[in-house]
Amino acid sequence: MSEKFDCHYCRDPLQGKKYVQKDGRHCCLKCFDKFCANTCVDCRKPISADAKEVHYKNRYWHDNCFRCAKCLHPLASETFVSKDGKILCNKCATREDSPRCKGCFKAIVAGDQNVEYKGTVWHKDCFTCSNCKQVIGTGSFFPKGEDFYCVTCHETKFAKHCVKCNKAITSGGITYQDQPWHAECFVCVTCSKKLAGQRFTAVEDQYYCVDCYKNFVAKKCAGCKNPITGFGKGSSVVAYEGQSWHDYCFHCKKCSVNLANKRFVFHNEQVYCPDCAKKL
């Protein structure tokens, strides 16, 4: 008498039927699905005996459920990457490791045009002016806190304007008496020589280089007849009765003693010390 060939679980005869052998036991397909089948990680349904199964690190999927967690591309017959418990296709795995755009927060992948500034990166078209929203891309810009401005908007909102030409000072520039100038606008009123970094004299809101001040503006010393510039040796001046002298030229007409910061007598347009004045 032959031994019975029955399902281990329901005891239904298996003779002439499809069955599965699991752990040395025979079971019908119905009982296999109910008691023995692995559960698909994705759909949470049992993986039946006649279904194709994918397993990886003690986890199981129907072959058509084994997809990239990002783009859902089927991966049953392709290479894949496991990252933080997620199954990813190679393309999405690359994106996962790629830097994120500060503007749109999407991955910047190989081939994308991008802009990097102080360790932060943007897609080229995401790097825009905080004011006008136009794309700055790889053009010139001005950072202001967390914002970025194109040249035009920065000039309008923040740049100082030259007191002479009233145009924005975008770089360099100088300040004189709290007023901003372009270096090329701050020039001698007579010869147009640039005065930035040079000695100059201001007379009634007009600016002169040393040579032009000497030749066209400076008073002449009543003693030596040379210009009194206020520079160098002649920086100290004596003025009296509408006339001016270098301090070193202000001396007695007769004895030549220097009278700067001393008592003197002015007689017939001439300067005398008190002793010589008594002898006149």
UniProtKB/Swiss-Prot annotation:
The entry's note on the tissues where this protein occurs is: Isoform 1 seems to be most abundant in each tissue and isoform 2 much less abundant. Isoform 1 is highly expressed in skeletal muscle and lung, and to a lesser extent in heart, brain and kidney. Isoform 2 was found in brain, lung kidney and genital organs.
Instruction: Tell whether Nucleotidyltransferase is among the UniProt keywords.
Output: no
Which keywords has UniProt assigned to this entry?
A: Acetylation, Cytoplasm, Developmental protein, Differentiation, Isopeptide bond, LIM domain, Metal-binding, Nucleus, Repeat, Ubl conjugation, Zinc, Zinc-finger
Cross-link (Glycyl lysine isopeptide (Lys-Gly) (interchain with G-Cter in SUMO2)) at which positions? K86
Superkingdom of the source species: Eukaryota
User: Where does the record place a coiled coil?
Assistant: none
GO BP: cell differentiation; muscle organ development
Domain annotation LIM zinc-binding: ranges: 40-92, 101-153, 162-212, 221-276
- Repeat as UniProt keyword: yes
* Residues recorded with modification N6-acetyllysine: K4
What's this protein's function?
May have an involvement in muscle development or hypertrophy. Isoform 2 binds to RBP-J and plays a negative regulatory role in the RBP-J-mediated transcription in mammalian systems.
What protein is this chain from?
A: Four and a half LIM domains protein 1
Which species is the source of this protein? Answer: Mus musculus (Mouse)
